[in-house]
A protein has these predicted regions:
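Active-site histidine-anchored catalytic micro-motif
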Residues: 1-185, 189, 197-348
């Protein structure tokens, strides 16, 4: 029986396979971990964010090489742990090993570096298969194809073709606005800090004055997909280990309300225990609207329910962990949850 693929090469070894990198940048590699991305945990997200924070003053951009299976989760998590970064933080990986005869790894790494070196790049993004996606919008949709990642409910930031970065028009406008805001920050040496960020990085005079780093996550968050026949009493088994539940509803926001499988009482009890309830849809595109059908209307105006709108499940999981890591009251939880971060939600 053939052995399955496992991570083997270090970052430095991977870079040697793409000698063209030296033509566009000088770089240093750091080996934080060498694990299959299936084994990634929230503590690893914090470790990556901390590494970037420690090196932030010394580099112009950061590239995170990551396995594809959980890369969207890590990209979303870094979007919340490192906010408003004027320096690009780019995640990439590959469907085939770097040593493969027809690998996509070389081109993905080169294009990630190309995007990271561009003056108009900032914040957390995923570069994969010639597409650039917001860290909060990337989602792995294919298991084998080289164009495995899709930007969900938000346009691509850019495409990379023939070594040229072709930016989406609306995203290019946002880039110009971001640079203008950054120039304003540069001219204001004592810009106010965000009060909710207790671990804000004290910035030097310069471009770092608007970046915010966070170092807390609450990983007691469960994501549960509704399926036909699921019993409402499942929530009783979750109360001990979880502080928040992300419930993936049917369609545009359907939650069973039949006599045998009525979820209303179970979800009401969950909220009354002081736990957080987030409703989203298990359909990837176009988002949630609880007001459309009767099976969702009971929750449409419930103040105890957080609505995922058009966010990805990966972003919802990471954001809920981040929110619960910072907030101490229900009002704070709601305020942070509904605050758009790195284009994570636009539908209301």
């Amino acid at each position: 029986m053939a052995e399955g693929l496992t991570p083997t090469l270090s970052g430095e070894e991977l870079a040697r396979y793409v000698p063209q990198l030296k033509d566009i940048c000088t770089f240093k590699t750091t080996q934080l971990m060498n694990i299959d991305s299936t084994n990634m945990l929230p503590k690893h997200w914090l470790q990556i964010a901390r590494c970037i924070k420690d090196a932030y003053d010394d580099f112009d951009a950061f590239i995170v090489l990551h396995g594809t299976d959980t890369m969207a989760y890590t990209a979303a998590a870094l979007s919340y742990l490192i906010q408003n970064s004027p320096k690009p933080i780019v995640l990439t990986g590959s469907q085939q090993p770097m040593t493969g005869a027809f690998t996509d790894a070389k081109l993905n790494l080169y294009q990630a570096a190309l995007f990271a070196c561009d003056d108009n790049s900032y914040d957390v993004n995923v570069v994969f298969g010639g597409s650039v996606m917001c860290g909060t919008r990337a989602c792995k949709q294919k298991t084998m194809s080289y164009n495995a990642f899709t930007s969900i409910n938000y346009p691509l930031i850019a495409m990379i073709r023939a070594n040229k970065i072709i930016r989406h028009s609306s995203c290019n406008q946002k880039s110009q606005e971001h640079r203008s805001a950054l120039q304003l920050a540069l001219s204001t040496p004592h810009a106010p800090m965000a009060s909710e960020c207790s671990n804000y990085k004290t910035a030097q005079e310069g471009a770092h004055s608007c970046v915010r780093f966070y170092e807390r996550l609450n990983d007691r968050v469960m994501c549960l997909r509704l399926t036909p026949g699921l019993k409402p009493n499942i929530f009783d088994a979750l109360t001990r280990d979880y502080d928040a539940l992300i419930l993936e509803t049917f369609g545009i926001g359907g939650i069973p309300n039949s006599h045998q499988h009525n979820f209303a009482a179970a979800l009401k009890d969950w909220i009354e225990q002081g736990k957080t309830l987030v409703l989203t849809t298990q359909v990837a595109e176009e988002g949630l609207d609880l007001g459309v059908y009767e099976v969702g209307q009971a929750f449409a105006h419930n103040e105890g329910v957080l609505r995922g709108a058009d966010m990805t499940t990966e972003a919802l999981l990471a954001k809920t962990m981040w929110v619960l890591g910072q907030a101490h009251t229900q009002d704070e939880i709601k305020r942070l949850f509904y605050t758009p971060i790195n284009h994570d939600r636009v539908q209301e």
